Amino acid sequence: MPHEQIRTWTRKTGLRGSLTPLKGSKYQIIDSHLHVVNFTQETPGGEALIYAMDQANIGRAVIFGLPVSKLWAAGEREAPDYYLANDAPCYYYGYTDVIVAELVRSLPAAQQERLYPLICGFNPVDRYALRHVERLYAQYPDVWSGIGEVLLRHDDLTAFTYGETARANHPALYPIYQFAADHNLPVLLHQNITSVTKNDHPVYLWELEEAVAEYPRTRFIFAHCGMSRRVNVPFYYQMVERLLAQYPNLYVDYSWIIYDVVICPDGKPDPNWLALTEKYSERICLGSDMVTKFERLGPELFRYDVFLDQLSDKARANLCWNTAEKLYGGNKNRVMQEQVAAIPAWQR
């Protein structure tokens, strides 16, 4: 969720071509991780999104809202515009999915086809959460392409959010995972691998693995490989490689902070990540993780070029387009398949 200046965006304005980043990547991309509302549930709208996609060479986009909204507390004179703007809490906000669905429906049919919307506006610790998913699919049967981004363990945001701590293996999510399997829908999860103060081992990774192992028919996408602000562990690429080798139903997206911190630090691709990407390119996609601010899509995606340039043609095509299209593109307008009763293992 970029809300700060990333050093790979810095350009020497005196050089020719300094406006090139505004045009996005030289490779056409499916942006597989794009929030179209902010933390106060405001959106620039569908026309602004399509315009920005065209300017940034984004052919299609996987879009979703935000499942939480920032409270404007009585003691705060200035309205917050981000979850870190002040110390006020966040609360779950189900209407975010309606905002996304109506944004899509407001566009011409040809532009709607470029968008793969996901549903995310449920409380992941509420065992009634499945009902929200079912209602939204029934209300907008021609819209959804998957579920997510489900915000689970998320450093400061976890502390700000009302209620029980969300986690990938919470019992409230198991019926949703089963629903996703029955309808062949991918599930995008934000699950930090560890806490801010535990950077020597992945404290929370077992929660993700338990869910992924319990639902082998559900396709999970591990958002930005489990990294967040101040969240890191040694040998990160080895951990990701082990996960992809062990769980064939697990995918990852390269987005937000992981790219600049470990994949391509200081704008120099790490050879270990290049090798991992070549090996598992069919399970990796790229995303901006922008929270609205569509005008920044170009620079955000442009910075991937230095990494993409060093991949084989096949791996590059998978990251830029094929993996995301395989995950999300085949599900559009197919959400009304018959649902099988969800009976997770822990209830049998």
Spell out what each predicted region is.
Residues 37-45, 69-72, 90-96, 122-130, ...:
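Acidic-and-aromatic substrate-binding clefts and catalytic sites of carbohydrate-active enzymes
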Residues 4-22, 77-195:
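Active-site gating/metal-coordination segments in enzymes
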Residues 17-21, 47-55, 129-142, 175-179, ...:
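Short amphipathic alpha-helices and their capping/turn segments at secondary-structure boundaries
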Residues 34-107:
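N-terminal carbohydrate-binding/catalytic regions of secreted carbohydrate-active enzymes
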Residues 46-47, 86-104, 129-133, 169-173, ...:
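Well-ordered, non-membrane alpha-helical segments in soluble/globular domains
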Residues 30-34, 60-63, 115-120, 145-149, ...:
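Hydrophobic faces of well-ordered beta-strands that scaffold small-molecule active sites
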Residues 6, 13, 108, 154, ...:
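Catalytic pocket-lining loop regions of alpha/beta-barrel enzymes
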Residues 1-32, 41, 45-60, 64, ...:
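Mid-to-C-terminal alpha-helical segments outside catalytic/metal-binding sites
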